[in-house]
Amino acid sequence: MDMDKWIFIKTKFETMIAYLSGAMEFADDEGSGWRKDLTKWLDLNLGHNVYDPVIQSAELIKKYGASDYRNWKESDPKRYAEFIRICVDYDIETVRNRTDYLICLWDNNVLKGAGTHAEVTLAYESNKPVFLINKIPKADLSGWIMACSTKIFNDFDSLKPYLLDKYR
């Protein structure tokens, strides 16, 4: 095979990107711990990249000088909503157009927020696989979220062999 054909074939394959969805606003450490662990695993075992909204939010906070944005919720609600809207728009664009599948940690922390619900729904609407790690009693899991999920797992240890089989 000549070099031109090899380069074309090599560049034709793009790295898959997973969106790591889950609670941030009401979660300890904004949910960064499980996302860091899964990011390493996906890279090491599948060569997949991730979109980590915790990291992206930190970049947006810096870009827009919003280090104290959480205080704005009560002190300046309009400013708070404007900044959150920037984050929401970025996340919507990313789920729809920049990622290949979504991994979601569904626990009690997501129940007070709205972003995770929206991300799961957007991924479903965009025909992207949604792999849900359910940490609440099945009786309490929303039928909507169940319907939007491609497959539901009890823990990350159950998800990993499935991903290996599907993507390796």
Located regions from the model:
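Conserved catalytic or regulatory cores that recognize and/or transform ribose-phosphate-containing ligands
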Residues: 2-168
